[in-house]
Swiss-Prot record:
Catalytic activity: UDP-N-acetyl-alpha-D-muramoyl-L-alanyl-D-glutamate + meso-2,6-diaminopimelate + ATP = UDP-N-acetyl-alpha-D-muramoyl-L-alanyl-gamma-D-glutamyl-meso-2,6-diaminopimelate + ADP + phosphate + H(+)
Protein name: UDP-N-acetylmuramoyl-L-alanyl-D-glutamate--2,6-diaminopimelate ligase
GO CC terms in record: cytoplasm
Keyword Ligase tagged: yes
PTM summary: Carboxylation is probably crucial for Mg(2+) binding and, consequently, for the gamma-phosphate positioning of ATP.
PANTHER family listed in its UniProt record: MUR LIGASE FAMILY MEMBER (PTHR23135), UDP-N-ACETYLMURAMOYL-L-ALANYL-D-GLUTAMATE--2,6-DIAMINOPIMELATE LIGASE MURE HOMOLOG, CHLOROPLASTIC (PTHR23135:SF4)
GO molecular-function terms, A-Z: ATP binding; magnesium ion binding; UDP-N-acetylmuramoylalanyl-D-glutamate-2,6-diaminopimelate ligase activity
GO biological process per UniProt: cell division; cell wall organization; peptidoglycan biosynthetic process; regulation of cell shape
N6-carboxylysine PTM sites in chain numbering: 225
Keywords: ATP-binding, Cell cycle, Cell division, Cell shape, Cell wall biogenesis/degradation, Cytoplasm, Ligase, Magnesium, Nucleotide-binding, Peptidoglycan synthesis
This enzyme's EC code(s): 6.3.2.13
Motif, Meso-diaminopimelate recognition motif: chain positions: 414-417
Length: 495
């Protein structure tokens, strides 16, 4: 299939498809060009079949369209000389189609999928960094962007469309990538965007409240994540045994690797396991001692907080399960770097320690505050807000958490979007026992500045919610704004 051809592409599904040379594959009629294959799916917002005339006018070579309500599965029609092949359940088949189109890229590198509410980005980055230190050419795909380490290009969604994912992977293979760590979102699993990928390993970090505006309730959210193990080629399963959902899944996955820092492992029950035996937190990170099926060791980590110890142990267990030697992993561990905007520490002489983190769920905020507290000798400040046009139920929960775990809560705007900023802040304050104690400043830069300038040298200021993002969405406008740049400027350091 080196010269992409419609007949070869559809061979497993439509034996009598016509022969047509194909250039690119796209779901977007606006970018469809001469010689392309236009795939007309029925999505949540639009029916791609309405754009078939536009794609034909732009010179596409062939069209594959959803059959439901239009034609029978495998039916071939012709419109203005362009073959239109109808397939039923096209969304479910899209990953496999794109995989064939791009020559099955997940067969040509080691692909590790990471799913869970929190920790996906850090765990994927640690996997990519660590494998690269051991000689792989490593890449990441996810929230921060896609690409080879150090050459990551920002993206809109955690998991792109099924076609985007295969296309990106093929591009990485073309750049000689040998290892890729990919964040796998619950939306991506439900919408079959990674359905045909062959994962060498699949990591589960944890499950807590998020995306309930999409999934409806926690049971549906858990079911969405479980799809990675039940419906996909998941390879080695690496599961966080400290998470209640993780423990449930371990009971269903006898060959999985159980990972714990809270002694939730009985070596007699789990075939392969890794657990922390002692963790000492200090100014610049943590010293972690562990035992495992592969042997014991000690790691010096530059990452802050208990959950980052968990992320590091998950990455370590994954690489051990994939056959990387323990001695080599221990030798390179001290060279692992924190991830941009994930418990990222900014310091300057005589100034408070400032930590920028992406925490935007109740659980993540609690963990970030607990993590910052481990490294805090003075007062702990928390600057945060909640996004507009998103799950409103989490706002009072986050207010309550900030009040309980921080000494000073500063409530500000996050991405208000089309909601009234003050209404969002009021929802947050409603969760506090004594809202009068919280400082309220709608302007985010002003709120961050106020906290950093008022905090003392041995205080820690956690700026939560935006992490690596370099924009703020107000109304329908995307404004330039970065917590990292704001903090760096205040401390006189480089972001």
């Amino acid at each position: 299939m080196a010269d992409r051809n419609l007949r070869d592409l559809l061979a497993p599904w439509v034996p009598d498809a016509p022969s047509r040379a194909l250039r690119e594959m796209t779901l977007d009629s606006r970018v469809a060009a001469a010689g392309d294959l236009f795939v007309a799916v029925v999505g949540h917002q639009a029916d791609g079949r309405r754009y078939i005339p536009q794609a034909i006018a732009q010179g596409v070579a062939a069209i594959i369209a959803e059959a439901k309500g239009e034609a029978t599965d495998g039916e071939i029609r012709e419109m203005h000389g362009v073959p239109v092949i109808y397939l039923s359940q096209l969304n479910e088949r899209l990953s496999a189609l794109a995989g064939r189109f791009y020559h099955e890229p997940s067969d040509n590198l080691r692909l590790v999928g990471v799913t869970g509410t929190n920790g996906k980005t850090t765990t994927t980055q640690l996997l990519a960094q660590w494998s690269q230190l051991l000689g792989e050419t490593s890449a990441v795909m996810g929230t921060v962007g896609n690409g080879l380490l150090g050459k990551v290009i920002p993206t809109e969604n955690t998991t792109g469309s099924a076609v985007d994912v295969q296309h990106e992977l093929a591009g990485l293979v073309d750049q000689d990538a040998t290892f890729c760590a990919m964040e796998v979102s619950s939306h991506g699993l439900v919408q079959h965007r990674v359905a045909a990928l062959k994962f060498a390993a699949s990591v589960f970090t944890n499950l807590s409240r998020d995306h309930l505006d999409y999934h409806g309730d926690m049971e549906h959210y858990e079911a969405a994540k479980w799809l990675l193990y039940s419906e996909h080629h998941c390879g080695q399963a690496i599961i966080n045994a400290d998470d209640e959902v993780g423990r449930r899944w371990l009971a269903k996955l006898p060959d999985a690797v159980a990972v714990s820092m809270e002694d939730h492992i009985n070596p007699n029950c789990h075939g392969r396991w890794l657990k922390a035996t002692e963790v000492n937190y200090h100014d610049s990170g943590a010293t972690i001692r562990f035992s495992s099926s592969w042997g014991d060791g000690e790691i010096e980590s530059h990452l802050m907080g208990a959950f980052n110890v968990s992320n590091l142990l998950l990455a370590l267990a994954t690489l051990l399960a994939l056959g990387y030697p323990l001695a080599d992993l221990l030798k390179t561990a001290a060279r692992l770097q924190p991830v941009c905007g994930r418990m990222e520490v900014f310091t300057a002489p005589g100034k408070p320690t400032v930590v920028v983190d992406y925490a935007h769920t109740p659980d993540a905020l609690e963990k970030a505050l607990q993590a910052a507290r481990l490294h805090c000798a003075g007062k702990l400040w928390c600057v945060f807000g909640c996004g507009g046009d998103r799950d409103k139920g989490k706002r009072p929960l986050m207010g309550a958490i900030a009040e309980e775990f921080a000494d000073v809560a500063v409530v500000t705007d996050d991405n208000p979007r089309t909601e009234e900023p003050r209404a969002i802040i009021n929802d947050i304050l409603a969760g506090m026992l004594d809202a009068g104690h919280a400082k309220v400043m709608e302007d985010r830069a002003e709120a961050v500045t106020c906290a950093v300038m008022q905090a003392k040298e041995n205080d820690v200021v956690l700026v939560a919610g935006k992490g690596h993002e370099d924009y703020q969405i107000v109304g329908n406008q995307r404004l330039d704004y970065s917590d990292r740049v704001t903090v760096a400027r205040l401390l006189g350091v480089i972001a």
